[in-house]
Amino acid sequence: MAIVSSNAGSSAPRREPVLDAQPLPEESSGRPDDGLRPKRLDDYIGQDELKQVLGIAVQAALGRGDALDHVLLYGPPGLGKTTMALVLAEELGVTCRITSAPALERPRDIVGLLVNVQPRDLLFIDEIHRLNRVSEELLYPAMEDRRLDLTVGKGSTARTRSLELPPFTLVGATTKAGSLSSPLRDRFGLIQRLEFYGQEDLEAIVSRTADLLGVSLSAGACRRIAGCCRGTPRIANRLLRRVRDVACVQGRQNQIDEGLVSQALSLHRVDHRGLDAGDRRLLAQLDQHHDGGPVGLETLAAALGEDPTTLESVVEPFLLQQGLLVRTPRGRMLTEAARAHLREQEVA
């Protein structure tokens, strides 16, 4: 689904999505520290249960003088998995080496990563569910026995050579924990899910980011941004940046109120529930052309001109979470709450 802030059918250049929790190019520049990330567990807002579990594990590892057990972090994008890995490295006082599974296509890629690991280092692999089978099999003995098994030579001259590895911690991050193979998943000592953030935590995050960006937000402005970000800090920070852009153009960086936030969100076609034009188009399609459903995914995707996988994995989760859409064996159905929201938007 095209979650974009530009008008449908417009000839203007397509803008970057503001309500997609995937990182934008400006947020994926390769710099692990953009100045907004917390550095210690005490500074990390929200995810209290996760912080408690990992805090105990960190203290125990430091007390033993050993590496932290391997950690798997899973959950929707934009909730702070990479940030938590960096925080763990800071708490442990070790180096964090960051990579992603798509960058480890060949065996030599992951071998090079493992042979250069230092004692107690933290190795972070994002999108770990996308590792290929060969890379996974190289990780098995490395994670369990701190050993790297290499095959040298070919055919009848091939022989296996084992290299001892220093103690290290692998932190894997994924949005699809079910896509990990059981042998890989079972080798993680700590498996933790990150949850969507509540309004109070999001307001604290927006307020903190505003301070770091040097902008002044009223309480109402902070509350409005936090209420439109789909429970996701990455989206909250992105919306704040777009609000800051409008404030900068109008010369109002030091007086951002709720009215200015509403103006900026309206520019990007984001409503008070955090739905954008693409979300409302899907709901309107069901309401106006299919009498609320049920409608099959393929039919709905064809009517909207979208890819079925995009609808299912990117668009629908938030609508389902908000109680605006229902999946049934016969297809997608609109809820009364969705109808009420569409009518409300028509009046507005």
UniProtKB/Swiss-Prot annotation:
Residue sites binding Mg(2+) per the record: T82
Protein name: Holliday junction branch migration complex subunit RuvB
InterPro entries: AAA+_ATPase, AAA_lid_4, DNA_helicase_Holl-junc_RuvB, P-loop_NTPase, RuvB-like_N, RuvB_C, WH-like_DNA-bd_sf, WH_DNA-bd_sf
Protein source organism: Parasynechococcus marenigrum (strain WH8102)
Phylogenetic classification of the source organism: Bacteria, Bacillati, Cyanobacteriota, Cyanophyceae, Synechococcales
One of the record's GO molecular function terms: four-way junction DNA binding
Parts forming coiled coils: none
Stretches for region Large ATPase domain (RuvB-L): 13-197
Subcellular location, record wording: Cytoplasm
Gene3D superfamilies reported in the protein's UniProt record: 1.10.8.60, P-loop containing nucleotide triphosphate hydrolases (3.40.50.300), Winged helix-like DNA-binding domain superfamily/Winged helix DNA-binding domain (1.10.10.10)
Domain notes: Has 3 domains, the large (RuvB-L) and small ATPase (RuvB-S) domains and the C-terminal head (RuvB-H) domain. The head domain binds DNA, while the ATPase domains jointly bind ATP, ADP or are empty depending on the state of the subunit in the translocation cycle. During a single DNA translocation step the structure of each domain remains the same, but their relative positions change.
Keywords: ATP-binding, Cytoplasm, DNA damage, DNA recombination, DNA repair, DNA-binding, Hydrolase, Nucleotide-binding
Region feature (Small ATPAse domain (RuvB-S)): 198-269
Residues that hold DNA according to the record: R327, R332
Record note on quaternary structure: Homohexamer. Forms an RuvA(8)-RuvB(12)-Holliday junction (HJ) complex. HJ DNA is sandwiched between 2 RuvA tetramers; dsDNA enters through RuvA and exits via RuvB. An RuvB hexamer assembles on each DNA strand where it exits the tetramer. Each RuvB hexamer is contacted by two RuvA subunits (via domain III) on 2 adjacent RuvB subunits; this complex drives branch migration. In the full resolvosome a probable DNA-RuvA(4)-RuvB(12)-RuvC(2) complex forms which resolves the HJ.
Catalytic activity: ATP + H2O = ADP + phosphate + H(+)
Stretch list, region Head domain (RuvB-H): 272-348
CDD domains cross-referenced by the UniProt entry: AAA (cd00009)
